[in-house]
Amino acid sequence: MAKLVATRYASAIFEVGVELNKEEMFYEELKIISSNFEENEKFFKMLKTPILSKQEKKELIENIYKDKASLEIVNFLKVLIDKDRISIIREIVDIYKQLLNENKNEIQAIAITAVPMSEESLKELTYKLCEKTKKNVKVKNQVDPTVLGGVLVKMGNEEIDGTVKTKLEKLKKQLHQIIA
């Protein structure tokens, strides 16, 4: 439910950004504001609490961000406060980034490996993913020793699991079925 709501808000502000040719700028502003909220938990809690009126919260947003963000983003934050949706700002920013990538025909991918990938391996994986998806894929390497070996690629809702850990788990399951 929260993802659906966040998608609606992200889509709405993204459309405005596209119309004004400010979609990149809007993303940067939203990302910074969301980070500010995460870094300053007391302030973020204050924006979510019913103790302050919506008008007081909007005045706070106006005073803090009027010189740091575009009028459209400040007004967007005020709408989130009016609709009691400021708490999903992180989800909105994440979905906005996906919309921005789709608009630029880009996909973000995470390659999870047991050890850091070499530059050559990363380039080869990027090339293969670009070929597979017919999109411009940006791959980031994340190290997780629990995968043991191989690679787990996450792109949006899709996962390509070529890890040793998963192969061992499948083998274990097959052996249990044979023995049982």
Swiss-Prot record:
Alphabetized InterPro entries for the sequence: ATP_synth_OSCP/delta_N_sf, ATPase_OSCP/d_CS, ATPase_OSCP/dsu
Topological type in the membrane: Peripheral membrane protein
Alphabetized Gene3D superfamilies for the sequence: N-terminal domain of the delta subunit of the F1F0-ATP synthase
Pfam families cross-referenced by the UniProt entry: OSCP
Principal location listed in the UniProt entry: membrane
The organism's place on the tree of life at top rank: Bacteria
Localization of this protein: Cell membrane
GO molecular function: proton-transporting ATP synthase activity, rotational mechanism
GO biological process per UniProt: sodium ion transport
Sorted UniProt keywords: ATP synthesis, Cell membrane, CF(1), Hydrogen ion transport, Ion transport, Membrane, Sodium, Sodium transport, Transport
CC per GO annotation: plasma membrane; proton-transporting ATP synthase complex
HAMAP family in alphabetical order: ATP_synth_delta_bact
Note: The ATPase of C.paradoxum is of special interest because it uses sodium ions instead of protons as the physiological coupling ion.
Function: F(1)F(0) ATP synthase produces ATP from ADP in the presence of a proton or sodium gradient. F-type ATPases consist of two structural domains, F(1) containing the extramembraneous catalytic core and F(0) containing the membrane proton channel, linked together by a central stalk and a peripheral stalk. During catalysis, ATP synthesis in the catalytic domain of F(1) is coupled via a rotary mechanism of the central stalk subunits to proton translocation.
Family that this chain belongs to: Belongs to the ATPase delta chain family.
Quaternary structure and interacting proteins, as annotated: F-type ATPases have 2 components, F(1) - the catalytic core - and F(0) - the membrane proton channel. F(1) has five subunits: alpha(3), beta(3), gamma(1), delta(1), epsilon(1). F(0) has three main subunits: a(1), b(2) and c(10-14). The alpha and beta chains form an alternating ring which encloses part of the gamma chain. F(1) is attached to F(0) by a central stalk formed by the gamma and epsilon chains, while a peripheral stalk is formed by the delta and b chains.
UniProt name for this protein: ATP synthase subunit delta, sodium ion specific
Native species: Clostridium paradoxum
Source taxonomy: Bacteria, Bacillati, Bacillota, Clostridia, Peptostreptococcales
Gene: atpH
